[in-house]
């Protein structure tokens, strides 16, 4: 099993969710986050004063899938989240050793 963590632009969340649903993903976790990479930040004007905003709003989407489904899901996220502009985000894939569904006690693949 693998966990896919995608950091994407907030307005792309619905497209990413739909793309993952088409891959058979039935559940995901979404967290509002802030960060920066090569995009750095931007300046904003507030009450006549200009200031630098270092951290940009993003959303973190986390799903756990069977190892065989990783490439398909990652490709779907890339297609859904890509704008072609700087700041589109990143995807991280990590190994998951164990999953337990608390309600039923199901383990691993059956708990996903």
What residues fall within each predicted segment?
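Positively charged, small/polar-rich N-terminal and surface patches that mediate targeting and assembly
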Residues: 1-112
């Amino acid at each position: 099993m693998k966990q896919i963590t995608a950091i994407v632009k907030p307005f792309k969340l619905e497209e990413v969710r739909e793309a993952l649903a088409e891959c058979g993903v039935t559940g995901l976790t979404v967290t509002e986050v802030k960060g920066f990479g090569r995009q750095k930040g931007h300046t904003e004007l507030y009450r006549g004063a200009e200031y630098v905003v270092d951290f940009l709003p993003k959303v973190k989407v986390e799903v756990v899938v069977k190892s065989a489904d990783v490439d398909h899901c990652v490709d779907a996220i890339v297609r859904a989240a890509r704008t072609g502009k700087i700041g589109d985000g990143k995807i991280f894939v990590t190994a998951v050793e164990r999953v337990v569904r608390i309600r039923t006690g199901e383990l691993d693949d059956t708990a996903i």
